């Protein structure tokens, strides 16, 4: 389970250290793809597989489903962890998420999100403003 928020530097080669407490679940590799909110999403293989199967089962005749499949799979890449627990963030994914010198690494239970400090600050502001009403709307689902 991934919990917490951490700030890490991105080196000149585009490598990012993943927090030590998260690394064991990845067993040396994971799948990195675009997140929905201008962040990147990093999945352990055992979390990625069920998600990939669900997304793949969406009807190809539905335009929204096709667009979502492209969003999830077109930029997805398998990343390997080096001995220092770093992954390489491909340039196109860094550009999408606005990542430059620093990243906010956020545990979201079964996956990890990687945010630029600016995008994370905007998201945190949104959560502070709308969090109570979001919780109220979703309370019936829990």
UniProtKB/Swiss-Prot annotation:
Asked whether the keyword Nuclease is assigned, the reply is no
Protein's cellular compartments: Cytoplasm, Nucleoid
Q: Which UniProt keywords apply?
A: Cytoplasm, DNA-binding, Repeat, Transcription, Transcription regulation
User: Quick one: a GO biological-process term for this protein?
Assistant: negative regulation of DNA-templated transcription initiation
Transcription among keywords? yes
Instruction: Give the matching Pfam families.
Output: MraZ
Cross-referenced InterPro entries: MraZ (IPR003444), MraZ_C (IPR035644), MraZ_dom (IPR020603), MraZ_N (IPR035642), MraZ_sf (IPR038619), SpoVT-AbrB_dom (IPR007159), SpoVT-AbrB_sf (IPR037914)
- Listed GO CC annotations: cytoplasm; nucleoid
What's the main place this protein lives? cytoplasm
Residue intervals of the SpoVT-AbrB domain: 5-47, 76-119
Q: List, in alphabetical order, the Gene Ontology terms for molecular function in this entry.
A: DNA-binding transcription factor activity; transcription cis-regulatory region binding
Record note on quaternary structure: Forms oligomers.
By sequence similarity, the record places it as follows: Belongs to the MraZ family.
HAMAP family xref list: MraZ
Q: What is this protein called?
A: Transcriptional regulator MraZ
Please name the source species.
Thermomicrobium roseum (strain ATCC 27502 / DSM 5159 / P-2)
| Gene (UniProt) | mraZ
